[in-house]
Amino acid sequence: MNLKLHNRDEVFLVKLDSALYFKAEDHYTCVYYGRDTKQLLPFGLAHIEDALELCDADYMRFGRSHIINLQKVVHVSATKEMVTLLTSDNTFLPIHIARTAIREIMAHLKDERPCEEGNIAGGGNF
């Protein structure tokens, strides 16, 4: 699925299936596809958030500076204030997130259905 954004002179297509997260950069937004792959968009994060809501994509805004692809989250650490995402080349990308946003992410993920095929809720003994 593509997110189509446009201004007067340009059209931008964001590949939502492979995007990991969006990060606010002043009045712009960077979309990250991997460790060294990013695209600068001339739109604020609020504009991106509104556009994503229309797409019904599995993205959620956390804090003032991040919108994260929830399908790519593999680990959240409140202690380290880190979210680890799985890239399309099956490598892990840790990103630093503000403590309040980490709590939002953890609360959201805990509220989701506890078990999906192959997952065990609650951890512990296997």
Regions found by a protein language model. Give the residues of each.
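Basic, polyanion-interacting recognition surfaces, primarily
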Residues: M1-F126
